[in-house]
Amino acid sequence: MKVNNIIKLMSFAAVAFIATACSDTDAQYTIPEVGAPEFVAATPESDADLLFGEQTFTVTFDKNIGFATKNASQITLNGVPVKSALVLGASPSLTITADVDFSKTQTLVIPAGLILGPQGDAYDQEIKLTWTLDDLPSNTAVAMTQKLGWGWNLGNHFDTSGDAISQGWGYWDRATPGAELFNSLAKAGAKTVRIPTTWTDHMNDNSVISADYLNEVAGVVDAAIAAGLNVILNTHHDSFETDLGNAANPEKKDVAKADSALICTLWTQVANKFKSYGEQLIFETFNEVHAGDNWSGGTAEQYDMLNKWNQYAVDAIRATGGNNATRWIGVSGYAANLDLTLNNLVLPTDPANRIMVAVHCYDPYGFCLAPVGADGTETYSSWGHNADPAYSVPDANEEYVIKLLYKLRKKYIEQGIPCYLGEYGCVVHTTDNANAFRKYYLEFFCRAAYMAGIPMLVWDNNSVSCGTVNGNECSSYFDHSTGAFVADGAEVVPMMIKACTSTDSSYWFDTIWSKSPTVK
């Protein structure tokens, strides 16, 4: 190889000398590159997280290279031939497209002799590149994930918002939650219950919350804690929840002032009521704050105002002292939307450094919350790699779910900031086949959350029709009074708990993938 290269260099030098001597111009000559290329680098870099799905790799050398595309099948990722490999124009880089599987370690192998230099000299070494997903770190965020585990929402029991109809507590579920319910939850394997609560409808003209109402809420909190459950208590559908657009309008400063004052006085009263409660109680500043009917996103001014509201709430809670000085507090971004929270939430300043991030995720929306169309038939009846393209949400399969939740891991969990899914779920569908896909989705989604280190609380609205008349809004797992399983809760709840808590390393995505139903 070396002798051949020396001969080439001598021949080239002679030709160059003759050409220069015979020329009567000032023309410049480019000396062509010779010799075999040398490997320089690859992207993604070795510390990158390669998640399931299609991935592009770029392998770069020290000079322009040649590659016969017919040899692409000899390049493998985890032993499987890549989808494509080519050099784009005159370039020192080989671009490879391959499917990343569920393995924690990905190994890309380019056999020796496939990469050629400008003069046909081959790179004579095998290139072997590996990427390994790190295990979850040992930090405060992961410890909180283990503490919260799998959880459940009391739905709209204390939700008194809505139209002009007088809605007292329990209007939506007509239940009396107590020891029987919470003991059943604990026995099933739940660790946390979220109690969504509307407060402003129980205030007098001086913004004082009814003592009877405070006691009623406290009684339910007490029953849950007595059963050994953690409790997340929030503000839910209060008067300011959809008023963000007005509060952020610079021409409506009076609205901003009034809403801010209301938030402070509300949280001061709630925090004082529970200031002696221990670590099992967690506060959550807001539910899904947004502007009017705009759920898809707001303006920079609205995001800024919501960040201020979170700070006001945290300050009000901390100022009450007692155990509230160090109590964990959950905060969320616009509409509690995952991406909007990631992109726009500014964590409040907190002397206790005990702030968690709360997000909600019902993705893909059509399959999870609104599968039934206006004609009563299912528009979205399947999900995942075996779904019917005509009856599923496009580009929202297993790959989408894994990457969606992993963003929370990178932004929060790996940085030691606890994060939880305050709401998730998928309504009971109207056909057996669609419900088979629903169960597959729930198991896969829960396992993806486990991989990301995210605890989760399923939404349960105690829809009495579940199991008989299913479809949109049918989200029931436990009877809100007795704690008995409803609909398919007895089957689905243990499955979800296992998926989001099991430490069995053999229980991985490929195990669930193989159980995917097919369209019938």
Give, region by region, the residue ranges found by the protein language model.
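N-terminal carbohydrate-binding accessory modules
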Residues: 135-192, 207, 411
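An active-site-proximal structural segment forming one wall of the substrate-binding cleft
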Residues: 173-192, 203, 207-236, 241-285, ...
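Active-site region of glycoside hydrolase catalytic domains
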Residues: 261-395, 406-426, 451-454
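Acidic/histidine-rich helix-loop elements
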Residues: 154-177, 205-209, 247-257, 366-400
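Acidic, Ser/Thr/Gly/Pro-rich low-complexity segments and short DxT(G/T)-type signature motifs
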Residues: 24-46, 112-136
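Substrate-binding cleft of secreted/luminal carbohydrate-active enzymes
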Residues: 398-485
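C-terminal motif of bacterial Sec signal peptides marking the signal peptidase cleavage site
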Residues: 18-21
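Short, surface-exposed alpha-helix to beta-strand junction/turn motifs within ectodomains of secreted
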Residues: 53-86, 113-116, 127-132
